[in-house]
Amino acid sequence: MSFTVLIPARLASTRLPDKPLADIAGKPMVVRVAERAALSGAERVMIATDDARVQQAAADHGHAAILTRPDHPTGTDRLSEAVDALGLPDDAIVVNVQGDEPLIEPALIDAVAAQLVAAPHADIATCACPLADAEALFNPNVVKVVCAADRRALYFSRAPIPWARDALAGGARVLAPGLPAWHHIGIYAYRVAFLRRFPALSQGQLERYESLEQLRAMEHGHVIVVHHTDSAPAAGVDTPADLERARAAYTNRL
């Protein structure tokens, strides 16, 4: 199985300025992400950034980075530019690992790539784990996904789906026993042909209402398959508290 890992790393961040360059045990966060990705089965790991400072930081630690335009509306648009710059063929597979995931498990990267390889009818693969509890089911910041028997995604939503009618009658807020409710994990594998088409896809109503980019692909008829894992991976770094947690994790490993 051959695939490339691309790590989009945008320097601007409202909650954590210069996030890709934040120090984690002596190295920039984006370098820590690249190190984790390099432990997967990827043939190549490449950082895609909008700032020369990130590119230089990667080079200083022996990692490749490509400089992309600063005006991309989404990380997926940035990937589209990167695959063209790298000259990847349409049938190649790219795994998108976010630049704020310094605790990503290499095995999860491999599993998502393998899920796409096993589904030639699909353009995208992603990942999900069982919902932890009723609080997660009703939390709009926890994205839910429902799947067909063949692991094809039927819908992603911030709403509590599937809706257990009887268990939730009368306003109850419970996680019904046996409910096939999955917590979406934002790691993606793409076929390069899809990434090249993505910038031309118009944003649909579902994406606008839910604010979920993956719905754009589904609204345009593209198939997403979902790898199921038993437990949620470590969360990414979005806040100063998240950064301290990641630093502590690395300190404990050293």
UniProtKB/Swiss-Prot annotation:
It catalyses: 3-deoxy-alpha-D-manno-oct-2-ulosonate + CTP = CMP-3-deoxy-beta-D-manno-octulosonate + diphosphate. Its EC number is 2.7.7.38. SUPFAM superfamilies: Nucleotide-diphospho-sugar transferases. CDD domains: CMP-KDO-Synthetase (cd02517). It is found in: Cytoplasm. Gene3D superfamilies: Spore Coat Polysaccharide Biosynthesis Protein SpsA, Chain A. Coiled coil: none annotated. Activates KDO (a required 8-carbon sugar) for incorporation into bacterial lipopolysaccharide in Gram-negative bacteria. HAMAP family: KdsB. This is 3-deoxy-manno-octulosonate cytidylyltransferase. It comes from Bordetella parapertussis (strain 12822 / ATCC BAA-587 / NCTC 13253). The gene is kdsB.
